[in-house]
């Protein structure tokens, strides 16, 4: 028998404030048509004054726990994927642990920017397979609205805030590709491309900084690397693109999503899309899409999913899982 990390519950949280493209027209030189044409984004959510990343994460975590029928102390490990933690330290994960009232287990953050949730899933899978954890709560949460340069129309219109979470549980199975759970993971990074996507602040500058991006170069790397890592993960699982029920991509930009799907030879009607409603929520985008996809009735038990993401670093990767 094989131990698999199986999704037992999923949930998400979006801040109340919805910001349509029309609202951004009054802030920066842009138009609704310009934003839609270049990104597919129609609206996004922004966190309220005083609402932190850990607040969003805790709300998503509670939703996932409710979906799983579990209590906080049923969880062994809590992982938060984020680039916008409330403080330099302690971790957002320990803050969420406290907010949930968890009194056991351990918690830590994963920082791989937009690829963070994929990295966090891979870490959770390894912990479960090795026997170090039985149930892992994996959260992606971001407040990227606070990193925007509102004079840079190429980037400030793209991002939003939100959080999503999944509960993974170790379950015995025969270990075939037909069994539920995470089947394969594939992770990569290449620090030579740091200047393509970064925030120009931190401890070395004493500032929070703003997001900087070379959009055309990021697009080129994204399409190539995302399709490649997805195919590699599928090969590790002994599967191919024709076996995929749903691609659940990082919701960065509709152009990247559609170009990657085309490169993988997967039709767009088998791609979960939320970018139009959420914008780019970085590490939160995949768990948000998983939760929304399930709520819509698209993702069903037994479906084969491929999640893929790329972010600053550059860091990228994919996970193949049977829902």
Swiss-Prot record:
**What's a Pfam family this protein contains?**
ACP_syn_III
Name the major location. cytoplasm
Gene Ontology CC annotation, any one: cytoplasm
- Give the first-level EC class, as a single word: transferase
Cite a single GO MF annotation: 3-oxoacyl-[acyl-carrier-protein] synthase activity
Q: What reaction is this protein's catalytic activity? A: malonyl-[ACP] + acetyl-CoA + H(+) = 3-oxobutanoyl-[ACP] + CO2 + CoA
Q: State its location(s).
A: Cytoplasm
Q: In which pathway does it act?
A: Lipid metabolism; fatty acid biosynthesis
- SUPFAM superfamilies per UniProt: Thiolase-like
Per UniProt, which keywords does this protein have?
Acyltransferase, Cytoplasm, Fatty acid biosynthesis, Fatty acid metabolism, Lipid biosynthesis, Lipid metabolism, Multifunctional enzyme, Transferase
Q: State the active site.
A: 114, 250, 280
Query: What Enzyme Commission number(s) apply to this enzyme?
Result: 2.3.1.180
Organism's domain of life?
A: Bacteria
Main role?
Answer: Catalyzes the condensation reaction of fatty acid synthesis by the addition to an acyl acceptor of two carbons from malonyl-ACP. Catalyzes the first condensation reaction which initiates fatty acid synthesis and may therefore play a role in governing the total rate of fatty acid production. Possesses both acetoacetyl-ACP synthase and acetyl transacylase activities. Its substrate specificity determines the biosynthesis of branched-chain and/or straight-chain of fatty acids.
Note the subunit structure. Homodimer.
Q: Report the family membership.
A: Belongs to the thiolase-like superfamily. FabH family.
Q: Domain text from the record?
A: The last Arg residue of the ACP-binding site is essential for the weak association between ACP/AcpP and FabH.
- This protein is called Beta-ketoacyl-[acyl-carrier-protein] synthase III
Q: Which organism is it from?
A: Cereibacter sphaeroides (strain ATCC 17029 / ATH 2.4.9) (Rhodobacter sphaeroides)
The gene it comes from is fabH
